[in-house]
Amino acid sequence: MRKALGISRIYNILVYIFLYAPILVLIIFSFNDSKNRAVWSGFTLHWYVDLLHNDAIINAFIVTLGVSVLAALVATVFGTLAAIGFFSMRRKPRAFFMGVNNIPMTNADIITGVSLMLLFVFFTQILNDLVYFVGMQTGFWLPVDFHLGFITLLLAHITFDTPYVILSVLPCLRQLDKNLSEAAQDLGATPMQAFTKVVLPQLRPGIINGAIIAFTMSVDDFVISYFTAGADVSNLAMEVYSMARRHISPEINAISTILFTIVMILLIVINVRSIRQEQAEAKRLHALQRDASR
C-alpha cells in the first residue's frame, strides 16, 4: 500500500514538472541579460523596459484590455439574464438551450473562429452594399467602410464568453430560495426592486466569477481573435505569435510572463472566491441542520 502511494506521488510530481517546468524556464529567462536562451548571463529588467518602448506591444495591450473588459461586461449582463431565463424554463426546453449553450465551449476554436469570420464578412458586405445603394439613390455618401476590426473582435469575444457566465450563474440560481422574490413583493417591493435588492445580491458570487472567467478567456484567446480581428487590429496573443514567427526575442518571454501572471492572479481570485462560497454554503447548511434538530 505504501509502495503504491509512493509511486503515485512520484507520478504526480513528474506530471507537475512536465506541465510547469517550461513556464518556469520562460519566467526565469525573461530576466536574463543575454539574448542567448540557453545561457544565464545575469539578472536584468531590460526586456520589460523594452516592452514599454514597443509601440506594437503597447497598442496590442490596449486592444486586449479594451476588448477583454468590454466583452466581460457585456457577456456578464447577457449571461446573467440568459441564466435566469434558462432557469425559469421547464425541464425539456431548459435542457435543449443548455445543450446549445455548451456548443461554443466544446466546439474547436478554429471552427468557431472561421464560422464567425464568415458570418462577419457576410454582414459587412451586406452593410457596404447597402451604403453604396443609398449613396447611388440619394447622392449622399456615408463616410463608412464596414470591415473586420475592433467591433468584430469584440462581438466574437462576447460570443464565446457568454456561455461561461451562464454556467457560473446557474449554480447560484439553483441554491436560491424561490420564495424570496415573492416575499419581497408581498412586503411592497416592485418586481424590479425585488430583483435588484433581493435576487441579484444572491447571484453576486456567480456573476463575479463569471465576469472574471470571461475576462481571462478574452485575455488568453488567440485562435478566434486571429480570424475575426482583421488586418488592422491585433491583441497581445496575436502580437506574440507574430513576433515568434519573425524571430525569438527575449521580449516574448517578458510579455508571456506578464500574460501568465495576469491569468494566474485572476484564477487565484476565482479559486479563493469559490472556496469561500463553498465554506459559506456549508456553514449555512450546518446552521439549518442544527436548527432543525432542536
Predicted region positions:
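Transmembrane alpha-helices
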Residues: 11, 16-23, 103, 107, ...
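Interhelical loop and adjacent transmembrane-helix boundary motif
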Residues: 2-4, 48-56, 219-276
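Transmembrane-helix boundary motif in ABC transporter permease subunits
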Residues: 1-5, 70-101, 114, 118-121, ...
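Periplasmic/extracellular loop-to-transmembrane helix junction in inner-membrane transport proteins
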Residues: 4, 35-71, 245-246
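C-terminal transmembrane helix and the adjacent membrane-cytosol boundary/short C-terminal tail
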Residues: 2-10, 86, 134, 170-185, ...
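Short membrane-interfacial helix/loop motifs at transmembrane-helix boundaries
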Residues: 21-55, 226-231, 283
